[in-house]
A protein has these predicted regions:
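Mobile active-site "lid"/loop adjacent to the S-adenosyl-L-methionine
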Residues: 126-155
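SAM/dcSAM-binding transferase cores
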Residues: 205-254
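Conserved Class I SAM-dependent methyltransferase catalytic core
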Residues: 25, 29, 149-206
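Residue-level signal for inorganic ion chemistry
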Residues: 36, 156, 213
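Short, low-complexity, intrinsically disordered N-terminal peptides in bacterial proteins
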Residues: 1-12, 68, 90, 108-116, ...
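Conserved beta-strand segments of alpha/beta enzyme cores
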Residues: 19, 70, 94-96, 191-194
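Class I SAM-dependent transferase core
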Residues: 2-43
């Protein structure tokens, strides 16, 4: 007799350095989370806050690369937060988990232990599908994870600006056709931008942008050469494969 299909899967990331339990259906962690983590700088002792952490994939990937960070995983969905907590424990990573709507405001953040000017690094993969152009999923968790309201991006960036110390780093991944929205939101309080377009293949337009910004930064914006997920023959890009195996970084991360 065959075993009934399980509600969850356990998947290997970073070449097996990280094993994460996640729902079989709904929003699932994948390439975006690992690319975001690879572009996020951190040092031992830094307080690193992952907004919209889901099962914890991006934040835990940073913690696997940089030992000794003080990781905080923030997620609105209590069930996903439980998975994130379990994933941290299963991978022997110390992480604080908080059930919180990133758009909730300063008072809710302070109550949850996220005071203003308290983080060295914030990373985030906000819901980014335009509801006007995206068919809403009947899966509520998937809808929350993928579909943005008009104010989602601005609210999340405002929360990052409030939470970060002066000179703190924000790294985010967003859809490429929404680059103008990101730049407009970052124009208030952030600078020293580094921008990396991500393409599915060399002949196609970018599908994602990864952006790193510094709170109060004054340096000129840097536009990096595009990252191709696949080459002209649709074969996986070697650099991307190294990143997914936990052997590479992006945007000059040390």
């Amino acid at each position: 007799m065959t075993e009934p299909q399980r509600e969850f899967t356990e998947d290997a990331f970073l070449g097996g350095q990280l094993r994460l339990r996640q729902p079989r259906s709904g929003h699932r962690a994948g390439h975006d989370a690992m690319l975001l983590a690879a572009a996020t700088p951190a040092q031992s002792g830094d307080r690193v806050v992952d907004f919209g952490a889901g099962i914890g994939a991006a934040g835990l990937a940073v913690a696997r690369r940089v030992a000794g960070i003080r990781l905080v995983l923030v997620e609105i969905d209590a069930a996903l937060t439980d998975l994130a907590r379990g994933n941290a424990s299963a991978n022997a990573i110390v992480a604080e988990t908080i059930v919180l709507d990133v758009s909730a405001g300063a008072e809710a953040f302070a109550t949850a232990g996220l005071a203003p000017d308290s983080a060295d690094v914030v990373l985030m993969n906000p819901p980014f599908n335009d509801p006007a152009r995206h068919r809403v999923s009947p899966d509520k968790a998937r809808e929350i994870a993928h579909v943005a309201t008009a104010a989602t991006l601005e609210n999340w960036i405002h929360a990052a600006r409030r939470t970060l110390k002066s000179g703190g780093v924000l790294t985010l991944i967003w859809r490429a056709d929404g680059l103008a929205e990101v730049l407009a939101a970052l124009d208030r309080g952030f600078g020293s931008l580094a921008i990396l377009p991500v393409h599915g293949e060399p002949t196609s337009p970018a599908i994602r942008v990864i952006i790193r910004a510094i709170k109060g930064g004054k340096a000129p914006t840097r536009l990096y050469a595009a990252l191709m997920l696949n080459d002209e023959k649709a074969a996986p890009n070697k650099q991307v494969q190294e990143i997914l195996a936990g052997k590479g970084v992006l945007l000059g991360v040390p």
